[in-house]
Amino acid sequence: MLQPKRTKFRKMHKGRNRGLASGTDINFGTFGLQAIDRGRLTARQIESARRAITRCIKRQGKMWIRIFPDKPITQKPLEVRMGKGKGNVEYWVALVQPGKILYELEGVTEEESRAAFKLAAAKLPIKTTFVNKMVM
C-alpha cells in the first residue's frame, strides 16, 4: 500500500479539507477518473480501486495514480481513557477536493476505460465521473 517512506514529523493535526483542487487536468493519459465530492481516501481504498482497474484492463495500456496518501491518521486503542497524548498512527489518507483527477488511463478503448473506472468508483467513498482529454 502507498505511504511515505519517511516524514519530518510522525503525527499531523486534523486540519480541514477546504479549498480548490490542483491537478484537475489530464496530464499523462487519455481518460481519467475525476472526483466530484471532497473527502479522504485511505491507502487501502486507493489500492483496491487500482486493483479493480488493472484486472479490468488485463495488463494492456498504462495507468497513473494521481493521488498519494501523505496524511497520517491516529487512533487510540479501544477502552482507553481520555488524555495521555495523541494516539498511534493507524493509516494514511489523501485529501481530495472536487475536480481532482484520481486515476488516468492510456492505451485502452473508451468503453474499456469506462468499465474499469466504473468498477474503481464502486470502491471509493466519494462520487466520481469519467473524463477524457480534450484534444485542441
From Swiss-Prot:
Q: Which GO terms describe its cellular component?
A: cytosolic large ribosomal subunit
Gene3D superfamilies tied to this protein: Ribosomal protein L10e/L16
What Pfam families does the record point to? Ribosomal_L16 (PF00252)
Q: Which domain of life is it from?
A: Bacteria
> Is rRNA-binding found in the keyword set?
yes
**What is any one GO biological process for this UniProt entry?**
translation
| UniProt keyword list | Ribonucleoprotein, Ribosomal protein, RNA-binding, rRNA-binding, tRNA-binding
Any one GO MF annotation of this record: tRNA binding
The record's annotation in InterPro entries points to: Ribosomal_uL16 (IPR047873), Ribosomal_uL16_bact-type (IPR000114), Ribosomal_uL16_CS (IPR020798), Ribosomal_uL16_dom (IPR016180), Ribosomal_uL16_sf (IPR036920)
Q: Look up keyword Lyase and say if it applies.
A: no
Tell me, how does this one assemble?
A: Part of the 50S ribosomal subunit.
Check the record and name the NCBIfam families matching this protein: rplP_bact
Family, according to the entry, reads as follows: Belongs to the universal ribosomal protein uL16 family.
Give a short account of what the protein does: Binds 23S rRNA and is also seen to make contacts with the A and possibly P site tRNAs.
- This chain's protein is named Large ribosomal subunit protein uL16
What organism does this protein naturally occur in? Buchnera aphidicola subsp. Acyrthosiphon pisum (strain APS)
List the gene name: rplP
